[in-house]
């Protein structure tokens, strides 16, 4: 039965530290392990994480070098009633940033306007056309939000025309900074600063709040600005760490009873449950409000969202929220249609993704505003980086037709999108991005060269075991331990999101009682699972309908969610990972401890060896002795260990089967595989055993073939996402391989001591 392509990485358990963190926080041991996985590995860190308000707040003026000068420029503009323009962007971060500064400057009595570039015709960021039009309208000061740091030409043009410019942005820095009057960007401050991970709306929030403070208007604005900060930060998938975590935690409490008519109307239009209105959860923004805002930026007019978020009239807000809702439904339909077409196209190519290692999917008539979403879904489905694009036709001034490609990229952890685009830059027009995502454009005639170059990059950076979506798992759980109490404790870890993901639990060998597909296009898989105590628990898997039916026994990775029905609340599992139950175990019982009284000697020469003899070891010479495997029931006077076997268990077997009088120890040291090589070999082995439906692995035999101990194999399997639940805890694969190397270098004296004890 086909299951989703996946590889699991299970965080190594740390029982001693878990006990300490659990005792100091009152959290269950499972959630203490989650805190440790998030880097909260001391009592102090974990307590601040759970209550971020207890840590003193650092003044942003001491962190951002240009913040005071930015405030001076703005104060002068406000007092002199200069015209100000905000240059925003068409994503959620840019639109909420624009709305945030608009509200602030309007409250201060400033004549302020805003400009958003055309997604369809101009692309991201401030441009010269915008600057020239603003100068013609008498604007004196431009503030960019969520853009500007890479717009050298546009900023230089503004300065030449006599305009002042304040850049507020959070994107990576170019080689040469633009000549703005002031630049606020967290990439210019200390990476250890709590402000380092703020999004564009975070920079705008700091500037607006400090400006309101100068004019004594902070009490009038603080709550409103915090709502917009929270909305933009989560919708932009910013890291929920540092100051973001502290402020978002506060902002979520405000959003449920928002003072902003636009937010209230959007909550109503999206159908968020009434019980969340006492305090929204991040997923309400990430899966309900954020998509409706972003949909407008993708395929509609961003003015709709900015007017919604700055509306003071509820009637107007409801009308605008309904427009957002309608646009989002159109966006959903477009995504589904393009996804179906993309999958059909990929299947028609009959590609071997192990050879390709990257997907390039270019088709005409796709809306480039939504292809990034489709790219993410294709990565989830195929487990490789996806470059998706659509062709666009235009006419040159001389009447000739010009064909170009405009695309988006989504990736996997081991493939850096920006570096890949740089590697292919000779074929590209414009490009940009970061390690996980990006965008590009190029002439259609460059497609073949671009694709070939991409495959070259992919083969340099991706190994076969990378070509499956990665599921990061926090901790093992028994289904009997899943409860409302645990779910309530998870709330203490909120807000969850980027940098602090929802806890992912896993349970081995779960029995599936029933399964069925549900929802639109039967896309969801609904399960009933045996909890092992005579009770059941429900599970839902979004977009897994095509995998029904799944096996009766599976390992599951999941998040927890509340299921409310008829005033009753229960816990159900939201599945994120599934695999066939496969646990490596010994096929044979370990050998008994060695009672042999053989004499140990360092091997000096093979010429004086007492026979019959068995020679064993890595890369041993062929010298006429029995070799490698002893003949059953044959007694040997000599056992020649050209090298040690992979483990003490292997050594026990050899000695007990040969019962030698003398054991000669050579100094040969096997060449060990690297962590990467071992994972590759085991990945291939797993695929072969899965095909043969094998559920047992002879670790001794496999260890002999690879010249590593069983604990090394299990450590590698665990890093590949296999739980190996019946095997004792292991250290990291890197540590186990170091220990393996030390084993092969052990002295006779130390070895005899180990055997005796």
Name each model feature, range by range.
Residues 2-3, 11-140, 161, 213-446:
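Hydrophobic helix-and-loop "lid/oligomerization" segment in the mid-to-C-terminal part
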Residues 111, 245-291, 295-345, 380, ...:
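Acidic, two-metal ion nucleic-acid-processing modules in DNA metabolism proteins
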Residues 89-90, 117-120, 147-148, 170-173, ...:
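Short, ordered loop/turn segments at secondary-structure junctions
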Residues 139, 161-164, 658-662:
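A short helix->loop->beta-strand "cap" motif at the edges of active sites that frequently abuts
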Residues 100, 178-217, 222-234, 656, ...:
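Short alpha-helices
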Residues 87, 139-147, 637-644:
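Acidic beta-strand-to-loop metal/phosphate-binding motif
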Residues 153-157, 359, 374, 489, ...:
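A short acidic, amphipathic alpha-helical/loop segment
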Residues 145-198:
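Histidine/acidic-residue-rich, glycine-tolerant segments that coordinate divalent metal ions
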